[in-house]
Regions:
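Amphipathic alpha-helical interface segments
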Residues: 16, 20, 44, 70, ...
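Hydrophobic alpha-helical connector segments
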Residues: 58, 72-98, 152
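Hydrophobic/aromatic-rich alpha-helical bundle segments in the mid-to-C-terminal region
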Residues: 104-107, 118, 138-182
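Basic, helix-initiating cap at the start of DNA-binding domains
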Residues: 1-24, 28-37, 54-57, 62-65
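Generic detection of well-ordered alpha-helical segments
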Residues: 7, 11, 15, 61, ...
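Amphipathic alpha-helical segments used for helix-helix packing
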Residues: 96-122
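Short hydrophobic/aromatic patch on the recognition helix
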Residues: 38-49
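Amphipathic alpha-helical packing segments from all-alpha helical-bundle domains
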Residues: 65-68, 113-153
């Protein structure tokens, strides 16, 4: 029961941080704002997150976990690699473009988010890589683990790149192209 309360409180704080960031922007959001929005004391917020930096990073990771959940749903009906990759890319690209906060932050205060997607990106990259390794492992056949890991890292890095700079072309076109390139590379390198 205590663990559930801790998880609920953590989620409440993250929801409050999201709402405050939408309302005030990331730079202007304070821990006091988050505490007020969550209807908790500042001390409670600080018990869960030692700094605003930690809170924003946790928020970034939670939003990435939401993308991953959406991608899992999208790829589930696709036992073959290419359609699964297309579904993964289309879902992620749409999710990134439709995210209520991402475009706003990238347009008005990119310096608040970019560190989590560049110099401090290892946890973000790791989550994306694990997702894509699952996709490749389940669908790529006899591809070496090293090549699978490299392809997964490439995909994760592309997702981060598209989060920072959206593609100029339609999501479906980008997804088809990326899936084609990856599948050709994997088949050729077997």
């Amino acid at each position: 029961m205590v663990a559930a309360l801790d998880t609920d409180t953590r989620a409440r704080i993250l929801d409050a941080a999201f709402a405050c960031a939408e309302r005030y922007g990331l730079a202007r959001t304070t821990m006091a704002d988050v505490a007020r929005e969550a209807r908790l004391s500042r001390q409670t917020v600080y018990r869960y997150f030692e700094s605003k930096h930690d809170l924003v990073f946790a928020l970034v990771l939670r939003e990435e976990e939401r993308i991953i959940a959406a991608v899992h749903v999208a790829i589930a009906p696709h036992p073959d690699l290419r359609p699964a990759l297309e579904a993964a890319f289309v879902t992620a690209l749409r999710w990134l473009r439709e995210h209520p906060l991402l475009d706003k932050v990238m347009a008005t205060e990119p310096s608040e988010l970019l560190p989590f997607l560049t110099v401090e990106a290892n946890p973000v990259l790791g989550l994306g890589m694990r997702l894509m390794e699952e996709v490749f492992d389940a669908r790529a056949g006899n591809v070496s683990p090293i090549l699978t890991a490299r392809a997964a890292e490439t995909c994760a890095r592309l997702f981060i790149s598209y989060a920072v700079t959206p593609p100029a072309e339609d999501h479906e076109v980008v997804a088809e192209t990326l899936a084609e390139l990856l599948c050709r590379g994997l088949v050729k390198k077997r």
